[in-house]
């Protein structure tokens, strides 16, 4: 039985004027695994992420998510399709004036027809699932530690039961203890939701943190995929760019 593909990037090129940002990218991200897109700053990672989310259209080629060519969808269809994605950014991007529970409730109020009582119960379950205890439900982000804010952001990302969870630089700038906490959280979340189908994508330049938890790695340099392999193969790569990156 062939492996299910979550995302297929087929001959994707992106130009802004004469500037080539992505250059004939070809790779596939398997479903129900953790795949990290690594690269130096300016490699094109953020531009690639925007293509995966349908926020940018390629100059050439196509991006498909679970077999659906994003280039065939209009803006309303794309907006609906993005509900397949949950996101956690480098900074949790919480609403400062909303409590932890209200932050998690936001997408449920925006995109579902659940009753207030149902939303509240779902938010409680989500917060508990990421180890935020009840005494913190009504705290503002300013009253939470950095690690707890990450957890609230993850709970919000999971609110709409996404098929794909996308983490953008989740460990950048964190101390080793918090980095381990975030990595454990990513793995625990992937394992917890694996049965119903969850694909994890990490965008990062933190090679040490991400190799510990990934199944596959795509290494991007100046808009080109230099290496796409399992983590084990990536560590043993003879490519000088890969070795330079690993040994930074």
Where are these regions (language model features)?
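Helix-to-loop junction immediately C-terminal to a conserved catalytic motif
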Residues: 53
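Conserved ABC transporter NBD signature motif
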Residues: 61-69
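Conserved ABC ATPase signature
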Residues: 140-144, 148
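A short, proline-enriched helix->beta-strand linker immediately N-terminal to the Walker B motif
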Residues: 159-163
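Catalytic Walker B motif of ABC-type/P-loop ATPase nucleotide-binding domains
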Residues: 165-168
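Helical segment within the ABC ATPase nucleotide-binding domain
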Residues: 180-196
